[in-house]
């Protein structure tokens, strides 16, 4: 067992199998562990706790395929951040809202996913009931909004097909799944249909069989 902090919500490892990150929605911290793939042992990196600030609530985290850029969404802060490593430790390089600046209806971020080619980032917004899309700068990883795409109510989870052509978002309050065509050139989403998904769809996972 590894003691972290209040409300560890998610865990993500890098492609090199050396680093594991754990965001905490309750304590506003991201823990950075060294991972020994031969033993499975995690060890907290010295100085490896990033404080993201009060009322942020880091929830999900993803590594860009280049290994340099890391993205986290902030549940209470309705925002997404770009992180990098400086001397091996996480530092915040950018924070952008996940909802329109004119929105004052509250809500909370849920899931965060990169497109299969790591050119775009998507964040689910509960309350605003949307998927926010961002283009990723090839130069520095900075995020630029490309739009907010309406979903079913309370989109807690979504998934992107491995070929990048479709995005599926579950509406926890409606019991329906919204199916989007995804433009692989500009990242925009176009809703095609909604289908019944049972009672309060909690998590979406694409499975090959």
Task: Give residue spans per PLM region.
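Oxyanion-binding "anion nests"
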Residues: 73, 78-85, 89-121
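Short loop/turn segments immediately following beta-strands, especially the blade-tip
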Residues: 33-42, 83-90, 134-141, 181-187
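Conserved beta-strand positions in repeat-built beta-propeller and related beta-rich domains
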Residues: 14, 22-25, 64, 71-75, ...
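Structural signal for beta-propeller blades
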Residues: 28-30, 78-80, 129-131, 175-177
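Beta-propeller fold detector
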Residues: 1-3, 42-50, 91-98, 143-150, ...
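Beta-rich, blade/repeat-based domains predominating
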Residues: 1-19, 51-69, 99-118, 151-166, ...
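C-terminal hydrophobic structural anchor segments
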Residues: 132-180
